[in-house]
Amino acid sequence: MTALRGGVTGTVTKASPGSVEETVARLADLVAARGMQVFAVVDHSGEAARVGLELRDTKVILFGSPAAGTPVMAAVPLSALELPLKVLVWDDDGQTKVTYTAPETLAERFGLPLELAGRLAGIGPLTDDLVGT
């Protein structure tokens, strides 16, 4: 796991070769190809610009599968605070980064048994494919 600026632990950050826009589009394609769905794309920088503020290119993609997430939320209702899964795609001084909360962190936070924690683990391979590692 990599810590972001400001000491945020429990997150994983990977460098993406594409722009923020390209990375978001590719992530949406990969999510769909795996039979999941994108529930929302939150354009933080776009909304900031809309009210006259400046923010580095910053977008959060919420995605998942009701078949995978529902058993987790049924067992641990508070896990709905973190589901669907989220990936932050952001510009870090000209380098696109992809950051998400590590599945192990989520499992520990909510005391998920291994069977349920495994339902969240696909975010690692998905983001590896996204960034080409």
Regions found by a protein language model. Give the residues of each.
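Terminal, regulation- and interaction-focused segments at domain boundaries
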Residues: 2-35
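A generic alpha-helix structural signal
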Residues: 24-28, 73, 120, 124-127
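Compact, glycine-rich, soluble single-domain proteins
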Residues: 30, 39-88
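Beta-strand/loop substructures that line and gate deep hydrophobic ligand-binding cavities in soluble
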Residues: 86-110
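Well-ordered alpha/beta subsegment
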Residues: 109-133
